[in-house]
Amino acid sequence: ALDLIVAKKDILRVKKDLLLPGGMPNIFALLWKSCQIREMTFRVLDGKLQATGELSLFFFYEEESETKKAVWYETTVPVSVAIECQGVREGMLEQIGCSIGHLEIEAKADEDGEERVILLDLVLDLDIRIYEETNLSMIEDLYGVAKQADVVRGKGQYRRLLVKNTAKTRVSDQFSISPGMPQLQQICGSFGEVFVQEIKKQSDGVLVKGTVNVQILYESAEEEVPCGCLKGELVFEELLETAEPVKNTCSCRIEASLEQLSVQAQNEQEAEVRAVVCVKGLICADCEEEIVTDALLRAPDPEKQANQPGIVVYLAGEGETLWD
C-alpha cells in the first residue's frame, strides 16, 4: 500500500549577491528582469528534504555612461538548500511542485562604491507530498475454537503504487519573425513556460501532452526599434510507461517543468529553438478487497457440537500434498 505521510505547503528562500563580470559596465538602472527555475530536484533524507538545482537569471539595464546604452546580462545561480520536514526519512517517495512565488532583483554598490552587485531575493512556493510504501495485512477469514464466530464482511480500500517515474523529452522548432517586426541581429535572452494540456490514461501508461510557450528577446540593427520580441510555441508529449494498464479510476500526479532552453539565430528572420521538458509522474491504483470488518461471538450450538467428529482423517491422493 502507498501511504501519504506529509501533505503541506512550504517555501524555499534563496538570497544571493552576484557580482558583474569585469567586462560588463556599471549599472545605472535596471530596466527588466527575469528568473526561471532549471533542473530542480528534491531528495528525502531523515527529517529534511534536500533541494538541488539551478536558477536562470536575466536582466536588462542601462549602463553608467553618457549614452545610457541598454545592456543585458544572463547567468545561472546554483541552489542547494536543506528544508526541515518532520516525520520523513530516507527512502520515502516525494512528489514536490515548485514555482516562483516572489522575486526581487536590485542593484547595489560594491566595496569600491560602484553599482556592480546584483541582490537576488527569491521565494519558491513548494507543494510537498511525501509517500511511503508499506506492507498491508488484511484478515480474510476467521473461526472460533471455544465460541461460534459469525464473520461480518465489508470492502477495504487502499492505494497501490504503479510507478513513480521521471522522463525527459526534447523538442525543437523554427520560429519566424512576424511581418512588421524588426529583423533579428543578435539573441539577447529566451524564456519559456510549460503548460500541461492533456493527461491520457491508456494500456501502456500515462500519455502527457503539453506546450512550451517561448519568448525570445533579440537585438535588431534598427535604431528606431533596437529590440524585438519573438513568440512561439513548442508542442511536446511524453509517455510514462507502466507494467499494467492504467484504468480511469487510477490517480495521477503529474509535474512538468522546463529543464533547458536554447535559441540560435539562423538568419535575420528565423531562429531555431530547442528545449528539454522534464515530466515527473506518480501513478497509483485505487484497490478494493473484501475483508473481515467485525466478528460476533456467541456460545456454540450444543447439538451441532455433539454431532461433530472428535477426529478427522484425510488420505491424500496420488500427486497431492498436505497443502492442496
Name each region found by the language model.
Residues 301-324:
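Primarily a LysM-type cell-wall glycan-binding module
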Residues 1-308:
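Membrane-lipid interaction segments
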